């Protein structure tokens, strides 16, 4: 779930699409499927970045259902670090994906001759077109809903700051015309 089953086959499809589009662009920004990523806000003390990375990794172990050594882990502060005093708690959004999920996507892209420059997570990638609008009202609460074929993501924000994220797997969606 959320993994590229056949990277070589996907690479071939991407190559064909690129030929059809007659593009020479090779740099790509993409996002991992909702089903491949665990997103969780956690709190850690503000400290030098290297130490904070270790603290996030240690704290994230409590929430990840597989060995921490098998994941690619990243985080982003939800409050600018310049606004937090050293030693105070800072809330960060943690993203964790199994290494094989990341490797499958990267293998397919590189196999198609592309150069991945950003690998984001789908719930946040969908917010980019809304960034300016969300930032205009920093105290307003927004719910962004992305309904997809394989999953739905909900992102609750105050202004442009995420408060909570949920990814829901679609069990089965039937679209019926008429009755």
Where are the regions that the model predicts?
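Glycine-rich beta-alpha junction loops
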Residues: 123, 149, 169-172
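Generic beta-structure capping elements
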Residues: 33, 97, 157-159, 171
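Structured loop/turn residues at beta-strand edges in well-structured enzyme cores
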Residues: 23, 114, 163
């Amino acid at each position: 779930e959320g993994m590229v089953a056949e990277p070589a086959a996907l690479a071939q499809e991407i190559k064909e699409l690129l030929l059809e589009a007659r593009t020479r662009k090779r740099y790509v920004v993409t996002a991992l499927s909702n089903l491949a990523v665990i997103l969780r806000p956690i709190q850690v003390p503000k400290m030098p970045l290297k130490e904070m990375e270790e603290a996030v990794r240690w704290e994230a172990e409590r929430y990840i259902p597989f060995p921490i050594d098998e994941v690619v882990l990243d985080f982003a502060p939800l409050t600018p670090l310049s606004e937090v005093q050293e030693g105070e708690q800072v809330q960060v959004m943690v993203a964790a994906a199994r290494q094989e999920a990341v490797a499958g996507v990267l293998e397919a892209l590189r196999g198609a001759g592309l150069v991945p420059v950003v690998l984001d997570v789908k719930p946040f990638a969908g917010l980019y077109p809304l960034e300016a609008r969300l930032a205009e009202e920093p105290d307003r609460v927004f719910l962004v809903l992305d309904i997809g074929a394989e999953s739905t993501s909900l992102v609750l924000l105050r202004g442009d700051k995420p408060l909570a994220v949920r990814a829901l797997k679609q069990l089965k969606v039937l679209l019926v015309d008429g009755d």
